């Protein structure tokens, strides 16, 4: 009977050790799982941050490209305005010259008609 009690006690101790071992292994597994989740989360955050920076960079590049295009359009507009102003001034000068010539011709005719030389 003492043998049976000893075996029962040994079995209980053995079961308790196995239970503690299983609990320790389970805790270790949970810790590994948590560490893996933390690592995955960290990796995800790093990737997300990288993608956001790339997006901002791309938006800045697009903005710079659009800005450059707008500057080119503005420069073309300025050139066109200068061309128009130049053409206008040339025509205005031609009109002034024509009026001067006409005035001079009228004066000459009046001189001739009045007998002034």
Swiss-Prot record:
Alphabetized UniProt keyword annotations: Ion transport, Sodium, Sodium transport, Transport
Keyword Cell inner membrane among UniProt keywords: no
Bias kind Basic and acidic residues: ranges: 7-20
Keyword Transport recorded: yes
Superkingdom of origin: Bacteria
Recorded family membership: Belongs to the V-ATPase G subunit family.
Protein name as annotated: V-type sodium ATPase subunit F
Source species: Enterococcus hirae (strain ATCC 9790 / DSM 20160 / JCM 8729 / LMG 6399 / NBRC 3181 / NCIMB 6459 / NCDO 1258 / NCTC 12367 / WDCM 00089 / R)
